Amino acid sequence: GWRPLPMYDRIGAVYDFVRNEIAFGYNAGDELPASAVLADGIGQCNTKGTLLMALLRAVGIACRFHGFTIDKPLQKGAITGLAYVLAPRRIIHSWVEVAFEGRWVNLEGFILDAPYLTSLQRRFPVRQRFCGYGAATPDLSAPGVEWRGQDTYIQKDGIADDFGVFDSPDEFYARHGSNLSGLKRWLFTQVIRHRMNAQVRRIRAE
């Protein structure tokens, strides 16, 4: 189990589990409980963040939720066609802040699993600023997503609005809602997200 590990290793074990055992993908909604994200075996920033917070707290690590929006172009490539047209111009985004050595450390680099990120790096083999396919980073070739006791980012360069920190994802969604509602949400849940996940799987398999 993770609980007996030193704090640094405990955070790292939970972080690596959520990053790589829960593959990048699109769930039915942002507000899913951690148990549903775990059952899906896939997630994006918000759903993987919910699971990360639940697991960190389960092993005695204090953490909090930081809500944002990101600009839609960050998702272009991972989201294509009708899905991209229907997506809001600014998409609800979040990262997790973990209490470590007397400060809050921002954790965002868990969103893209290593096989998917490696495929992006092969597809775009340049050391430069990159935005698209679920990443927005100053250096795609070395984005700094591994847990080293410091902030990790993979979408930070796409952030538009900052909604501040919350004790839980539920508190945030109660105040700011989620990305889709009504007919758009139904289409996303029943049809579009499956196409998006197929696209992500294609990229990962390259």
Model-predicted segments: where are they?
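Secondary-structure boundary elements
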Residues: 1-40
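Non-catalytic alpha-helical scaffold/packing segments enriched in small hydrophobic residues
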Residues: 13, 51, 95-98
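Generic structural hydrophobic/aromatic packing signal, biased to beta-strands
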Residues: 14, 56, 63-65, 107, ...
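Active-site neighborhood of thiol-dependent amide/isopeptide-bond enzymes
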Residues: 26-92
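His-Asp-centered catalytic microenvironments across diverse enzyme cores
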Residues: 70-206
